[in-house]
């Protein structure tokens, strides 16, 4: 009986750098730590595997199934591509905008992969999931007990933290009946004030850890323009070492918790305490001063 792979998922609001962070981290898990990895992209943008495959968007399960007639007509080799570090890549895809539910594509894809034995022999299955909305579809890797460990990519910006708290709420809902747990917050820095302290404090309140603080560096964008991870583009760069540290922490992470999401009032007060947003009194005083 082969060991079961660890099923992890990266969630985070759109534009936070979730796919970039996950691919850079997984590249290190594969190359430095010798882990066998499959990425299952669950974002309708289908960009969860671009930096591993060094290509534009990969053909998706839903698109290929539609071309052939149904998922039953697909073969595993039609949808699985091998990229940097031997990482296997699949994009579930999504429907045309305004039609249907993207979550259905995720469900269809994961069921197909499991039935075809795609997960056999893997150390990690990684789901890359849009996280602004934890609707039924996007919550599917959590809800169906597929993903066991959730990592939330966030920053010190208000909307990123708001999304992180919402995702924690979604995890809590399913953690009580299933085995899904929160593995930690990954701070993908936007260089906002006191960001490290702020996310550490948010993590504490959510009953988790800030597993790593990823500093902002232009080399990430330079690598992205070439459709590469930093590890492939410039393995000696200090930023590659940041992703190596994060990969190591995930590999050895034993702090898997049931989160304690906070109320909106508490989140807003936290942002005021750290100076991210002003309280009304300060804002009014500033406006009055500007008016004189």
Curated annotation (Swiss-Prot):
Binds 1 [4Fe-4S] cluster per dimer. Keywords: 4Fe-4S, ADP-ribosylation, ATP-binding, Iron, Iron-sulfur, Metal-binding, Nitrogen fixation, Nucleotide-binding, Oxidoreductase. One of its GO terms (molecular function) is 4 iron, 4 sulfur cluster binding. Its cofactor is [4Fe-4S] cluster. It is an enzyme of class 1 (oxidoreductase). It catalyses: N2 + 8 reduced [2Fe-2S]-[ferredoxin] + 16 ATP + 16 H2O = H2 + 8 oxidized [2Fe-2S]-[ferredoxin] + 2 NH4(+) + 16 ADP + 16 phosphate + 6 H(+). [4Fe-4S] cluster binds at residues 101, 135. The key enzymatic reactions in nitrogen fixation are catalyzed by the nitrogenase complex, which has 2 components: the iron protein and the molybdenum-iron protein. This is Nitrogenase iron protein 1. It comes from Paenibacillus durus (Paenibacillus azotofixans). The gene is nifH1.
């Amino acid at each position: 009986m082969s060991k079961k792979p660890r099923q992890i998922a990266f969630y985070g609001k759109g534009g936070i750098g979730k796919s970039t962070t996950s691919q850079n981290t997984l590249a290190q898990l594969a190359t430095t730590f010798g882990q066998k990895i499959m990425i299952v992209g669950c974002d309708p943008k289908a960009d969860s595997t671009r930096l591993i495959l060094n290509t534009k968007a990969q053909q998706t399960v839903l698109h290929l199934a539609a071309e052939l007639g149904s998922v039953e007509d697909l073969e595993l080799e039609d949808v699985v591509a091998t990229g940097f570090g031997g990482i296997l890549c699949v994009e579930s895809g999504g429907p045309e905008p305004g039609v249907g539910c993207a979550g259905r594509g995720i469900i269809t894809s994961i069921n197909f992969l499991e039935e075809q034995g795609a997960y056999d022999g893997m150390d990690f299955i990684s789901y890359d999931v849009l996280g602004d909305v934890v609707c039924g579809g996007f919550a599917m890797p959590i809800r169906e007990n597929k993903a066991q460990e959730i990592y939330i990519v966030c920053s010190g910006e208000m909307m990123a933290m708001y999304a992180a708290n919402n995702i924690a709420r979604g995890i809590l809902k399913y953690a009580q009946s299933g085995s899904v747990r929160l593995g930690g917050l990954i701070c993908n820095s936007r260089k906002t004030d006191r960001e490290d302290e702020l996310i550490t404090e948010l993590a504490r309140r959510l009953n988790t850890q800030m597993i790593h603080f990823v500093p902002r560096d232009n080399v990430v964008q330079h690598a992205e323009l070439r459709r590469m991870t930093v590890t492939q583009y410039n393995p000696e760069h200090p930023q590659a070492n940041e992703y190596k540290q994060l990969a190591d922490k995930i590999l050895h992470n034993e702090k898997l918790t049931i989160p304690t999401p906070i109320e909106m009032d508490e989140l807003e007060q936290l942002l005021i305490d750290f100076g991210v947003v002003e309280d009304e009194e300060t804002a009014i005083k500033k406006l009055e001063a500007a008016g004189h």
